[in-house]
């Protein structure tokens, strides 16, 4: 008789499988990042980071002329060292309104932009802390002001 795992453990295993599939579409060094943050983050957090990083690399390819001829898998840490604060501010602007790979409109408000920039900050901090990046422009980017939600009574 096989023992069934508790729900949260089943979900964790599903999320690990999903993360492994997602990392196959990201530059190889991203796997190191996910391994490095694994002890301090949940699988759902790492999946959200993987999604956010894929949006970032797509932005670089679509919107930055320096990287326009590159594929997502071809990015290296040396390329990340070339990113400036201005590039990241342009990324924040891009996040407000864009089209995804299925040509669907995507709109992000402050909260969504903050999450994506926070993911990027964690990503840059990890590689800066491990001395694989010389620069950390993400540390210099200010997060958008979060407007409080109305209280409905």
Give residue ranges: language-model regions.
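N-terminal core-binding DNA-recognition domain of tyrosine recombinases/integrases
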Residues: 30-44, 54-150
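N-terminal DNA-binding module of tyrosine recombinases/phage integrases
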Residues: 1-47, 62
């Amino acid at each position: 008789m096989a023992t069934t795992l508790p729900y949260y453990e089943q979900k964790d295993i599903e999320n690990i499988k999903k993360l492994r599939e997602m990392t196959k579409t990201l530059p190889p060094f991203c796997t190191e990042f996910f391994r490095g943050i694994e002890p301090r983050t949940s699988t759902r957090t790492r999946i959200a980071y993987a999604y956010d990083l894929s949006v970032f690399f797509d932005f670089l390819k679509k919107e930055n002329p320096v990287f326009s001829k590159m594929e997502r898998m071809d990015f290296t840490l040396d390329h990340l060292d070339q990113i400036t604060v201005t590039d990241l501010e342009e990324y924040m602007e891009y996040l407000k309104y864009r089209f995804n790979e299925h040509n669907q409109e995507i709109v992000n408000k402050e909260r969504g932009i903050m999450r994506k920039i926070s993911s990027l900050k964690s990503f840059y901090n990890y590689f800066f802390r491990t001395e694989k990046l010389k620069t950390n422009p993400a540390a210099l980017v200010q997060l958008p002001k979060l407007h409080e939600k109305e209280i409905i009574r």
